[in-house]
């Protein structure tokens, strides 16, 4: 099984692994990466807004958004790898024997436990994406009007991370 550090991966290598038969990365990691991409667009809008006279009244807000978005981006990348960590043991369950009733019962029990464990990371990704949506809403209202379409794309990435 290939493990990949999402933050360190080349885009091409990550996409190749994502499109392979390997169980990880998968949808959870991809949704976290979508969150990180949307976050990056939010940071871009902040940087396009900072230092502009027209947006001087929003300078402190922009600095706060920048700090929060940097934190969220790191969390998205960490969650992409964490998703692979918690999904790998679940994927191994499919290889457990299930010839006898005892084996079937054991496999079912272990799969249920690992499914529960694996479900927490996607929930965290959704929570972070929802938090990011709040910041993106503020950026749409207070950020550079020249970058409002970038905020819109960031919102779509956040929605992808939630779905």
Question: How does the language model describe each region?
Answer:
Residues 44-56:
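Transmembrane signal-anchor/signal-peptide helices with a preference for the extracytoplasmic
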Residues 6-24:
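Short, hydrophobic/aliphatic alpha-helical segments
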Residues 83, 87-156, 160:
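Amphipathic alpha-helical interface segments
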Residues 53-92:
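A structural-propensity feature for long, helix-poor, extended segments
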Residues 33-37, 65, 72-79, 118-128, ...:
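Amphipathic alpha-helix face/heptad-repeat signature
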Residues 20-41, 147-162:
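Conserved phosphate/anionic-ligand binding catalytic regions in large, soluble enzymes, centered on
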């Amino acid at each position: 099984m290939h493990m990949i550090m999402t933050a360190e991966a080349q885009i091409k290598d990550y996409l190749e692994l994502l499109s392979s038969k390997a169980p990880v990365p998968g949808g959870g990691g991809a949704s976290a990466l979508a969150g990180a991409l949307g976050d990056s667009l939010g940071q871009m809008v902040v940087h396009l807004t900072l230092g502009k006279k027209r947006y001087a009244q929003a300078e402190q807000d922009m600095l706060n958004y920048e700090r929060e978005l940097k934190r969220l981006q790191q969390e998205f990348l960490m969650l992409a790898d964490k998703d692979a960590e918690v999904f790998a043991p679940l994927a191994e369950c499919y290889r457990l024997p299930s010839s006898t009733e005892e084996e079937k019962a054991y496999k079912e029990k272990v799969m249920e436990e690992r499914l529960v464990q694996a479900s927490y990371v996607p929930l965290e990704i959704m929570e972070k994406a929802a938090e990011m949506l709040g910041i993106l809403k503020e950026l749409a209202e207070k950020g550079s009007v020249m970058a409002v379409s970038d905020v819109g794309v960031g919102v779509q990435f956040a929605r992808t991370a939630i779905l």
